[in-house]
Amino acid sequence: MSPDEQLVLGVLGGMGPAATVDFLARLQAYTPADRDQDHIRVIADINPKAPDRNTPGSGAGSVLAEMAGALHGAGAEVLAMPCNTAHAHADLIQRASGLPLIDMIDLGAEAASQKGAMRVGVLGDKGALKLYREYLAARAMSLVSLPPEQQEAFMFTLYRIKAGDLGDDVTREMQRHAEELRKRGAEVLIAGCTEVPLVLENEDVKLELVDPGDLLARRCVAVCLRWEPLPHAPA
């Protein structure tokens, strides 16, 4: 395909920065290319100043909408956002930019469904859990979450990763959270925060681990190379 026929991808990033860099690396790795010009054009706003997506009234939605509008103005034709929780603002982002957004929550839920699971364990913050509960329920699946005290411990683990700690003890902590979900009846796991796969791989857990960020990178390549259709544009 001629580079002129490819779609330009706009990335709303920085939530967190390491997860965005990981996403961009996957995007590059999954693009078949013999030369630089074969790669997808990507316009990224890596904005770690976006307000906390879990804090009501933080203004995160308006900041994300502004970022999306700027990406459109810079030439983006389709959007991706490697942050699960920020998808709570997906409709606002699409309306503000006039661009379709490739939905990583939908990709994660659909992957779990295709594996035949009925009970899905999600390693995510409260915002991500809410989103996945809705998307899974739409597919007649139920979400398995950590008990309150361990959910707090998970958040502590998550912020260690955000602070740059990718050590073995952090991996062991994340394995412990994953094992608790298995014991509570989960049949498959979803990495519901993009930091989780930075320390946890499929071989680290006893259940299959769905990585929505990886699925998002693969779908972005497929859409931008026109192997798959664009998502529905906002009304």
State where each predicted segment sits.
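Non-catalytic structural scaffold of enzyme domains
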Residues: M1-A235
